[in-house]
């Protein structure tokens, strides 16, 4: 499968697996809630309040069970706002649960969806919550990069640019925005340069919770059409970027390290989509690109730095060979046609010539037809070639 098709299929599979059936979650006591405490830490101790399998609410999970764990306080960020939920492990004195994704449930509950990989755990147990540091760190890099990207797009393209959607996970970022045409290579390069400049400036990323009125006074951007409560969280990267955002971010833009746009395309009328990479994703992208160039250079029997010149020379050689081939085909066609002066016939005052040639394609038949038209003057020309299939041309002189 094409990488983009495979990636889309994987995302569909991910989206289809959201833990237990919704009716199972409806059975949970609505008074039970969860609190997210993971903006500044990746581990915490908490009490298990709910356990479910994929079919029902249960009191305990045993090794091999797939299900959902709910605790009163968690450092796991749930999927929302375009950010993919955290992965990691939940440990108790008797067992270990691998968290494959974290989801937001009704009533303020946060569900940790995954598999019981060791022992067992029960409702009421004290659990140690551990988010995967690498997973969170890479997701944060991509999320913070989308904020820099939006501001860079508005700087290069204009203030009409507004976010229409986004998705971030540890591997890449996707950003949808309003714009009336495809971006030029120069515009994409300018946006990349701006983002990488802000990364190099090592700008501290500051978050603050304030009233929505206070947030608007700071110039922070809100997502169009989004509903906000009385208080909002504002993520600021110096004076360059300020946005309403509840997601997790790097502490400093320098943590993003690198930024690279890998695609820009339209997804709807007036909406464009950028896919991009950061840090290790960029390094991997260039490593794969370098490998491709080396393979191409090997096939072309040239050094990588000479590949462009080699390809240009090969193209010139191909054009020359094609031209020579056309000349040879014309000569062969003329030879196949032979001397036709004696083949010209006349019926009721109309001259005509009918002949057969072998090994001639349709293009050469037309050329031969033009040649014979010149010889016959006013009349009809019919040429037939049979090389597995019948090809013919019939040309009447212009006067007829």
Model-derived features: positions:
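Divalent metal-coordination and catalytic microenvironments
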Residues: 81, 147, 175, 234, ...
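Conserved nucleotide-binding/hydrolysis modules and their immediate coupling elements
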Residues: 21-129, 369
């Amino acid at each position: 499968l094409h990488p983009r098709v495979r990636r889309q299929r994987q995302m569909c599979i991910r989206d289809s697996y959201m833990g237990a059936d919704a009716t199972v979650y409806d059975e949970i006591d609505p008074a039970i809630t969860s609190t997210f405490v993971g903006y500044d830490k990746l581990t915490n101790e908490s009490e298990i309040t709910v356990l479910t399998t994929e079919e029902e609410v249960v009191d305990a999970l045993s090794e091999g069970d797939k299900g959902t764990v709910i605790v009163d306080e968690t450092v796991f960020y749930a999927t929302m706002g375009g950010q993919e939920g955290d992965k990691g492990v939940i440990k108790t004195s008797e067992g270990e649960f691998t968290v494959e994704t974290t989801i937001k449930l009704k009533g303020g509950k946060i569900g940790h969806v995954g598999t019981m990989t060791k022992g067992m755990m029960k409702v009421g147990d004290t659990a140690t919550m551990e988010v995967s540091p690498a997973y969170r760190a890479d997701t944060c890099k991509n999320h913070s990069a989308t904020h820099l990207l939006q501001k860079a797009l508005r700087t290069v393209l204009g203030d009409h640019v507004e976010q229409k959607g986004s998705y971030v996970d540890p591997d890449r970022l996707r950003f949808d925005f309003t714009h009336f045409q495809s971006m030029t290579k120069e515009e994409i390069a300018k946006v990349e340069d701006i983002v990488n400049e802000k990364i190099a400036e090592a700008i501290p990323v500051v978050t603050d919770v304030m009233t929505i009125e206070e947030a608007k006074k700071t110039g922070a951007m809100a997502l169009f059409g989004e509903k906000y409560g009385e208080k909002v969280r504002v993520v600021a990267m110096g004076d360059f970027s300020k946005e309403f955002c509840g997601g997790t971010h790097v502490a400093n833009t320098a943590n993003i390290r690198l930024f690279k746009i890998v695609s820009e395309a339209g997804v709807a009328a007036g909406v464009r989509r950028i896919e991009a990479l950061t840090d290790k994703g960029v390094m991997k992208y260039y490593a794969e690109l370098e490998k491709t160039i080396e393979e191409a250079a090997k096939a072309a029997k040239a050094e990588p730095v000479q590949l462009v010149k080699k390809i240009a020379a090969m193209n010139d050689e191909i054009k020359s060979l094609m031209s020579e081939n056309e000349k040879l085909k014309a000569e062969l066609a003329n030879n196949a046609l032979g001397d036709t002066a004696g083949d010209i016939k006349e019926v009721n005052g109309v001259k005509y010539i009918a002949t057969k040639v072998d090994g001639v394609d349709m293009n050469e038949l037309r050329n031969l037809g033009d040649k014979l038209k010149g010889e016959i003057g006013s009349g009809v020309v019919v040429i037939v070639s049979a090389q597995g299939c019948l090809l013919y041309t019939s040309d009447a002189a212009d006067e007829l």
